[in-house]
Design a protein with these regions (language model features):
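Thiamine diphosphate
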Residues: 22, 28-148, 159
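Metallocofactor- and cofactor-centric catalytic cores in central/energy metabolism, strongly enriched
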Residues: 4-6, 21-22, 26-29, 33, ...
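Conformationally flexible catalytic loops at phosphate/diphosphate-handling active centers
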Residues: 150-225
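N-terminal amphipathic/basic leader segments beginning at the initiator methionine
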Residues: 1-13
Length: 313
């Protein structure tokens, strides 16, 4: 059924349809409505935690017990939850686990303008980044598939404009899921130094496999344009700004997976245009990765680091 939904409500709907059973979050704009909307579904146990670290640990406990779980917070809350995040990257999960984090470009309700994508790279966990409500719903469901397929928590990065904008979504029924049996595995789940040393290579191999998956994943796509003098790499809200300003004039590489990035796809796209441009909010995250790959491009030398990209475009 087609419905008009806020981005945050669409995330909640995606969690519901994917069979999420436990939600533990700490409130903070622009993430709060995800948990508020989840609380409307009787099939999901929802709670507000004392802080983001506790929320993440509750969700992790539910995952270990075999339930699909979610924890939500705003960008500064991920600082509080960083301790368990980095260790959970090593342990992996049992039931799928999704971590929703909402950035606030423009600081509409926040004390800083940090970019959560750096946490995905540092913690070596995948991150999905929707650009509208339809993708918010779809990516929430996809995040669970990735989590269980690759044995990892998955970050779902929202931002103010996507979280609080409305667009059309297609809803379906909830897919009920049996709990995945817990199997005691001290070497996997108890991160004493001896165990952690053996888990680190597993994490690196997982990142390599995720990068391969990203090369052909439908969340990353090239949209052709008539004029190949300029090619634009973009993501999240910035994709909407680019399409509003440029329409179909220039080819666009729209990245729905913020980490790991599809290097082969990026190189092929760069080779197909005369001038490569990256349009993104907050830090030059994609830009820095492209430059590290040896690609020449225009990025934050043309657009500011601060605020959102709408006015600058």
């Amino acid at each position: 059924m087609k419905q008009l939904m806020l981005g945050n409500a669409a995330v909640a709907r995606g969690l519901y349809e994917a069979g999420c059973g436990v939600v533990s979050s700490y409130p903070g704009t622009p993430s709060t409505e995800i948990t508020e909307e989840c609380a409307k579904y009787d099939e999901i146990y929802c709670e507000w935690a004392p802080n983001e670290k506790v929320a993440m640990e509750v969700a992790f406990g539910a995952s270990l017990a075999g339930k699909r779980s979610f924890c939500g917070m705003k960008h500064v809350g991920l600082n509080v939850a960083a301790d368990p995040l980095f260790t959970m990257s090593y342990t992996g999960v049992n039931g799928g686990m999704v971590i929703g984090v909402a950035d606030d470009a423009g600081m509409h309700s926040s004390q800083n303008e940090q970019d959560s994508r750096h946490y995905a790279r540092a913690a070596k966990v995948p991150m999905l980044e929707p650009s509208d409500s339809a993708e918010a719903l779809a990516f929430a469901k996809l995040a669970y598939e990735l989590s269980e397929q690759f044995d990892t928590p998955v970050l779902l990065k929202m931002c103010t404009r996507v979280a609080h904008s409305q667009s059309i979504v297609d809803t379906t029924e909830r897919a009920e899921r049996e709990m995945i049996p817990y199997e005691k595995n001290i070497a996997k789940y108890v991160m004493m130094p001896g165990n952690a040393k053996r888990r680190h290579p597993v994490v690196e191999e997982r990142t390599r496999k995720l990068a391969q998956w990203a090369e052909t994943a439908p969340v990353n796509r090239v949209e052709e344009g008539a004029d190949h003098k300029i090619g634009i790499i973009t993501s999240s809200t910035s994709y909407q700004y680019v399409k509003e300003v440029c329409g179909d004039r220039f080819p666009v590489l729209k990245l729905g997976m913020a980490w790991p990035l599809p290097e082969g796809l990026i190189r092929d796209f760069a080779a197909s245009v005369d001038l490569l441009t990256v349009v993104e909010e907050l830090d030059g995250f994609i830009e820095a990765h492209c430059r590290a790959m040896g690609l020449a491009l225009a990025g934050k030398d043309c657009l500011l680091y601060t605020s959102d990209a709408a006015d600058e475009l």
